[in-house]
């Protein structure tokens, strides 16, 4: 029935495609139908997710189903008369980068299990930086060799080939990680794949944007060093922007009484995070890097200055927005295979690129894993940080490509642009279906341990703070709820609420905080001497102590400090 409705709607004024944008009423009609189609598909994807999870079906993930459903609907739209709705539901990189990607990146940083992440930080950074570079160069060289042979009349420059390599080096293992969650796979493997993926996207984006600056220019030996310099500067300035805005948010929550107004507090936290993304993009830096580290900083510091309601709201709002975006993206990708009519498909090039993507992932994972294992054996002689072969194989299998690559491909220009975009889209969908659809089976084949309990359940990390467990806190919450429901202020006659929220005490309290903060800064100034005189094995422990004893006292409320140093 839906098919009949769609065909009838598309047939209406099907000959008026050239008038697209000239009739506002007709444009609004088609926009409504396009959004309706996408929302129905999104609801269907979420209901599928509910069914799969409730029935504990692990053989296939709902994201793969979402891609197939998107492909079917995209095919229906393609064969129907008219192009207006077809153009509206096609993949647009602007929508992706400005609307769909930020919630996913923010939630990734905010939900990051920091103790596991930093415990495996060396391995994660190795795969994210060196691994992405190896993948991009390997893929770029293989693609360039193919174009040099001039099959299918495809001729590419070396910069175009490397840009293609950077585009298809962005991994997106959402499907794999979701299956890992359902199987409760070992946290070490989960953390390495998760950490690599979130940093890998940022590295791939910065690498692609760096290469685009050399498009059409003559390459020299020093171009390599120039490109590396631009990459490093862009990455670390973006990181600094994200961390700075996260720290500013933590201080804002500490020195204000926003916790009295949880709805305003939650809105400000969300907007501050998005500010880091768009400010960084506006400065020609990487918004993905900024937003990722802003989310990590918010969770590490600002989280403990939030009210209990703000903790709940930010956690689940970020998670809901990310899940909606992820499902929407998979549907979007499936539809785009048929709705983007200007793409140029070259079957042999697509096949060669798919093989090259697999080869580049192999050249990334296995040599680096062996190098890391050798380093860990020589350094400490134990097997705690050892990456077994089964984990290496799973890392290789988890390297499926995602929507970031498709969005980056929109930046291609020149006569090969449509071919490169089409190839990227097909390779992404193929890897999602092949690797994502067989992940559960690979876990069984590799005999990877499952049913492992997580160190910390993410839903239990929002614990009541000591002062929130008191009867006064319940009275305060009741007072605020009554205040929200009526215009009359409600005053609670309790010493706790008077000390914390009496406006007459704000100035003295702030002066005490500022004085205490100045003393903490003085302590921090001399603490770095210990770091540079400590051994390499003690530096990680020193950084942890420095964070808990110096940085957190500056950024966290004294009442929240004990809770904030538990992680």
Swiss-Prot record:
List the Pfam families hit by this protein, alphabetically. Na_H_Exchanger (PF00999)
Which Gene Ontology MF annotations are present? potassium:proton antiporter activity; sodium:proton antiporter activity
Q: State the name under which the record lists this protein.
A: Uncharacterized Na(+)/H(+) antiporter C15A10.06
Its Gene Ontology cellular component terms are: cytoplasm; early endosome; fungal-type vacuole membrane; Golgi apparatus; Golgi membrane; late endosome
On this chain, the residues bearing Phosphoserine are: 515
Q: Which organism is it from?
A: Schizosaccharomyces pombe (strain 972 / ATCC 24843) (Fission yeast)
Its keywords, alphabetically, are: Antiport, Golgi apparatus, Ion transport, Membrane, Phosphoprotein, Sodium, Sodium transport, Transmembrane, Transmembrane helix, Transport
Q: How does it sit in the membrane?
A: Multi-pass membrane protein
Q: Cite the ranges annotated as topological domain Lumenal.
A: 1-31, 86-87, 150-159, 210-227, 299-315, 367-392, 446-567
Side Cytoplasmic, residues: 53-64, 109-128, 181-188, 249-277, 339-347, 414-424
What's this protein's family per the entry?
Belongs to the monovalent cation:proton antiporter 1 (CPA1) transporter (TC 2.A.36) family.
Per its UniProt record, what InterPro entries does this chain match?
A: Cation/H_exchanger_CPA1, Cation/H_exchanger_TM, NaH_exchanger
Task: Indicate where this protein resides in the cell.
Answer: Golgi apparatus membrane
Q: Which regions span the lipid bilayer?
A: 32-52, 65-85, 88-108, 129-149, 160-180, 189-209, 228-248, 278-298, 316-338, 348-366, 393-413, 425-445
GO terms under biological process: potassium ion transmembrane transport; proton transmembrane transport; sodium ion transmembrane transport; vacuolar acidification
Give a yes or no for keyword Cell membrane in this entry: no
